[in-house]
Amino acid sequence: MEFISVAIIATDKSVILPQCLESAEKISDDVVIVTNSDHEFLNFADQKNYAASKCKHDWVLSLDADEYLSPELIAEIKNLDFSKAAYSIPRLNYIFGRPIFHTNWSPENDRHVWLFNKTKSHWEGQVHEHVIVYGSIGQLHHPKIHYNYQTVEQFMQKINQYTDFEALNKNFNPIFMFI
């Protein structure tokens, strides 16, 4: 198995799930936690690129503080041949305490690159960030677990955060004031 670093992104107010750290430590000797109070970041991509830059290994697994690796995913990563530049991983979302198996938030539809070689990739995107990979992308089959929103209030806070990011990154055009 290749050496992997785990980069965990957390807001300054978030509580890191114990499962997040426990699962990260099962695949890595290098766990990096970056909060938005460490530096002022304009967007999530900047924060995730910063976290990857602090990782000591070339292979980086990206987690948010409200995510953890399923035991099946841990085993799959440990047996991986690392022949690709990156790997996409499905995500099983829990919203209001319930797993989501339908819509765009189902594991079949919510699949992204979260395991990547940082020498062959980087994060881009203002709000819904994604990894740009220079090379081929493999697919893992077992999901990481994501506890999105426990309450409606958390859901609304996230929407507000996304709209704030969008507003900060919009190019001002005075013509639209008159249309």
Residue ranges of each PLM-predicted region?
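Catalytic-site signature of metal-activated, phosphate-bearing donor transferases
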Residues: 44-53, 59, 63, 70-179
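Conserved beta-strand positions in the Rossmann-like core of class I SAM-dependent methyltransferases
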Residues: 32
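Short, acidic/glycine-rich phosphate-metal binding loop used to engage nucleotide
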Residues: 37-44
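N-proximal low-complexity "stem/linker" segments adjacent to membrane-targeting elements
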Residues: 1-26
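Receiver (REC) domain switch/active-site residues of two-component response regulators
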Residues: 29
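Acidic ATP/Mg2+-coordinating residue in the GHKL
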Residues: 35-36, 64
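Acidic helix N-cap motif at the loop->helix transition within catalytic regions
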Residues: 16-19, 37, 72-73
